[in-house]
């Protein structure tokens, strides 16, 4: 029996194979994308930035009378430009802490986000109702060096308004609290201790750079103490009670 070669049939088979191959790749890509969306579905929390940033920018630009925040203790705190290092590390501290929990533990990420977003929202409301600022920044620096240059840069970018309570202080406390309650990080005491030291230095930096009054720091500490039980203590009591019931 003689078989006839049909070039059109061969071409059709090849096209079917190519189509099946491409379809398989597309299906795998879609499946992987769905898996990533499901895995990182808590990314919706980041949409809070669309609320916070426009509101904060409005507060920074609006023309109004600001109540000056000042404490007698501020006059005894010297200007120390070297604290610009921990002050700037705040941005790294928050970013790394947030990213760590985002990619490793959804529950801890939600608690960190709840703590930060609650305090930042209260901050926005306070500054909207009670416009505030300070007049603590030095007119001239006692020394000229790379650190004072960095401070000068921060002064030019950040207005001395909307300072009560201090978000630098509050968010540092939030990051430290999240790290302290992390089960995985409890195995790495060096990381925890290092974060506590950095957090404390960041808090100190706000007053030594004259970016905040001691009043702003106290207000941030008070706000953290009020929100902490709702985010951490209450939740952990519920979890402990549930585990006891299961036993």
Regions found by a protein language model. Give the residues of each.
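N-terminal transmembrane-helix/juxtamembrane module of multi-pass inner/ER membrane proteins
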Residues: 22-94, 142
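Aromatic-anchored segments of alpha-helical transmembrane domains
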Residues: 53-55, 120-128, 197-207
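Membrane-interface loops
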Residues: 60-73, 102-186, 238-247
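Membrane-embedded alpha-helical segments of multi-pass membrane proteins
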Residues: 86-93, 167-171, 218-222
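Interfacial helix-loop-helix junctions of multi-pass membrane proteins
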Residues: 140-141, 159-164, 201-227
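C-terminal membrane module of polytopic membrane proteins
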Residues: 213, 219-247
């Amino acid at each position: 029996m003689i078989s006839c070669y049909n070039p059109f049939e061969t071409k059709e088979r090849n096209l079917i194979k190519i189509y099946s191959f491409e379809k398989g790749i597309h299906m795998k890509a879609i499946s992987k994308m769905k898996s990533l969306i499901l895995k990182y579905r808590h990314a919706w929390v980041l949409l809070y930035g669309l609320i916070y940033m426009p509101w904060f920018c409005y507060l920074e630009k609006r023309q109004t009378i600001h109540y000056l925040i000042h404490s007698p203790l501020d006059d005894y705190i010297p200007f120390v430009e070297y604290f610009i290092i921990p002050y700037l590390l705040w941005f790294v501290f928050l970013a790394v802490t947030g990213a760590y929990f985002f990619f490793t533990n959804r529950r801890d990420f939600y608690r960190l986000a709840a703590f930060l977003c609650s305090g930042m929202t209260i901050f926005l409301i306070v500054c909207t109702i009670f416009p505030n600022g300070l007049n603590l920044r030095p007119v001239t620096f006692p020394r000229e060096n790379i650190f004072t240059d960095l401070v000068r840069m921060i002064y030019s970018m950040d207005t001395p308004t909307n300072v009560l309570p201090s978000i630098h202080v509050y968010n540092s406390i939030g990051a430290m609290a999240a790290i302290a309650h992390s089960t995985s990080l409890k195995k790495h005491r060096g990381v925890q201790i290092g974060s506590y030291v950095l957090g404390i230095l960041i808090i100190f930096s706000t007053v030594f750079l004259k970016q905040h009054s001691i009043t702003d720091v106290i207000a941030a500490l008070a706000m953290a103490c009020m929100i902490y039980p709702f985010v951490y203590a209450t939740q952990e009591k519920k979890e402990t009670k549930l585990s006891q019931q299961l036993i």
